[in-house]
């Protein structure tokens, strides 16, 4: 922007030179134009009383006048050239200053317009980025996901074969970037201009979590959440770094005390899985959170009484009445179950969490669900951490550890399920307005991607980020013959991904070679002893 301001300034100098040259040309033409009739009458005639000598004297006088005038013009042109050269040197010096950050800052002080142009450019970057409104995207692969972070860890999708899904930032620039974002947020929260005199000071200990993503042609967006002054209150700051100074976009106070979540679970049989699900639901939703409604949509009548019995026992033991049981006939359809459960709600606009029976979530995730949704503006598509087969992971142990010890985010224990879009938080009004699920899809897979694409094609912001409190528990996957070829392929890919990590699968493939090597080593050791 500084360069553009200097270009505008030099263009004005060039225009000034052109005008001066035009003025000089006009003066020259006026000077060279023959005089009027009265002056022509004063010229001596060749046959007049003064004769030829008088005429030559007049010509010599006129020639001397023109010579003096031309010399004057040459001096003015030389002066203009010197001024133009000086201005050009200043322009080149300005270009050099533009590459030096310190000189640039001092240049802002000297050039208020250049500084204003720079600020206008940076704010234009904010408007172009997906900050205030969603951008229509062609496919699910065009969406830019967020990464999430706390004070100690970063939870990232792109790991390759060397990085980890959860890790401390090793690179200094990444650490400094996130630290600067938190410090900028704290500075804003503690600013005397924006806070009340009696407000407590905020510190890094109040920081809960943040998400960020980079649009490579615009900048990096940060959404940081801090503890509020009261229970269920939070402070959220949205910051944007447009490849330059970080800028605060907005500051808002959020009160989530009355934000109810309707957890909708479609189900057919799988009583044991549902029993484990309700144990987690009772601890996280009833005992810890207390702002949750449960909707179970059950297909068929086989084992239905067992499922209803689990619900009734939980209701009596925990004094929990906020649940709905819906029974549907016909074959299982996840999309239909979720659609019916969402439309069955008769209260005010409610936040929906589409969940499966083999999902484990924490109470912290429920707040993350609330923080990343907004009716008419944002929907939340978390990337959950999918557990590998415990029988493979802990095959060399004496016993498989309890579930609580298995749910750790490591490369050896699971992976970010970035190809799954089934677990989602969105307001009922947005779900209805977007058209809900495609009810023509039967069986496993496809309905979640279809709904996700609808939101990508809309003007709503789709928040896509890995979360540390949402886990997919491993279970053996059966791909039925009734599935279409595309569904069957998706099912088999999911089955392969669920078993173990790249290294662990390699150990299984080469286990015979490893065992043979160990036998040889054992034989060598025994032969040396003898």
Curated annotation (Swiss-Prot):
Its EC number is 2.4.1.174. GO terms for biological process: cartilage development; chondroitin sulfate proteoglycan biosynthetic process; chondroitin sulfate proteoglycan metabolic process; endochondral ossification; extracellular matrix organization; UDP-glucuronate metabolic process; UDP-N-acetylgalactosamine metabolic process. The keyword Iron-sulfur does not apply. Glycans are attached at residues 313, 322. A divalent metal cation binds at residues 358, 475. Residues 34-530 are lumenal. Belongs to the chondroitin N-acetylgalactosaminyltransferase family. This is Chondroitin sulfate N-acetylgalactosaminyltransferase 1. It comes from Mus musculus.
């Amino acid at each position: 922007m500084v360069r553009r301001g200097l270009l505008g300034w030099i263009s004005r100098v060039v225009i000034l030179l052109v005008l001066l040259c035009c003025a000089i040309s006009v003066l020259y033409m006026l000077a060279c134009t023959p005089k009027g009739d009265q002056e022509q009458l004063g010229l001596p005639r060749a046959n007049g009383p003064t004769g030829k000598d008088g005429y030559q004297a007049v010509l010599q006088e006129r020639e001397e006048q023109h010579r003096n005038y031309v010399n004057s013009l040459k001096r003015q042109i030389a002066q203009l050239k010197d001024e133009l050269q000086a201005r050009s040197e200043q322009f080149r010096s300005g270009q050099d200053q533009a590459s030096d950050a310190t000189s640039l800052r001092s240049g802002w002080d000297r050039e208020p317009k250049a500084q204003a142009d720079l600020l206008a450019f940076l704010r234009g970057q904010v408007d172009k980025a997906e900050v205030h409104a969603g951008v229509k995207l062609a496919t699910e692969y065009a969406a830019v996901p967020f990464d999430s972070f706390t004070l100690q860890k970063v939870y990232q999708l792109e790991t390759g074969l060397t990085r980890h899904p959860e890790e401390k930032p090793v690179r200094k620039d990444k650490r400094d970037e996130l630290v600067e974002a938190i410090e900028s947020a704290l500075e804003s929260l503690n600013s005397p201009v924006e806070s009340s005199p009696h407000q407590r000071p905020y510190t890094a200990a109040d920081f809960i979590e943040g998400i960020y993503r980079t649009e490579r042609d615009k900048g990096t967006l940060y959404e940081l959440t801090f503890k509020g002054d009261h229970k269920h209150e939070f402070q959220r700051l949205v910051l944007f770094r447009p490849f330059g100074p970080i800028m605060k976009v907005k500051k808002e106070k959020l009160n989530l005390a009355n934000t109810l979540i309707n957890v909708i679970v479609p189900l057919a049989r799988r009583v044991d899985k549902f029993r484990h699900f309700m144990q987690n639901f009772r601890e996280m939703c009833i005992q810890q959170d207390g702002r949750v409604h449960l909707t179970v949509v059950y297909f068929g009548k086989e084992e239905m009484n067992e499922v209803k019995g689990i619900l009734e026992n939980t209701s009596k033991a925990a004094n929990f009445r906020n649940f709905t049981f819906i029974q549907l006939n016909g074959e299982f359809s996840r999309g239909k179950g979720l659609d019916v459960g969402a439309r069955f709600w008769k209260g005010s606009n409610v936040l929906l969490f589409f969940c499966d029976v083999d999902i484990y979530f924490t109470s912290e995730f429920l707040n993350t669900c609330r923080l990343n949704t907004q009716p008419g503006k944002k929907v939340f598509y978390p990337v959950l951490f999918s557990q590998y087969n415990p029988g493979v992971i802990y095959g060399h142990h004496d016993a498989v550890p309890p579930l609580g010890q298995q749910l750790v985010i490591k490369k050896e224990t699971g992976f970010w399920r970035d190809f799954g879009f089934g677990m989602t938080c969105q307001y009922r009004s947005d779900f209805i307005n977007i058209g809900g699920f495609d009810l023509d899809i039967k069986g496993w897979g496809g309905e979640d991607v279809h709904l996700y694409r609808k939101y990508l094609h809309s003007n709503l912001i789709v928040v896509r980020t890995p979360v540390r409190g949402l886990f997919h528990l491993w279970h053996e996957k059966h791909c039925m013959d009734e599935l279409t070829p595309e569904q069957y392929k998706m099912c088999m890919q999911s089955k392969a991904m669920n078993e173990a990590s790249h290294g662990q699968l390699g150990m299984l493939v080469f286990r015979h070679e490893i065992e043979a090597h160990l036998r040889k080593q054992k034989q060598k050791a025994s032969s040396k002893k003898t």
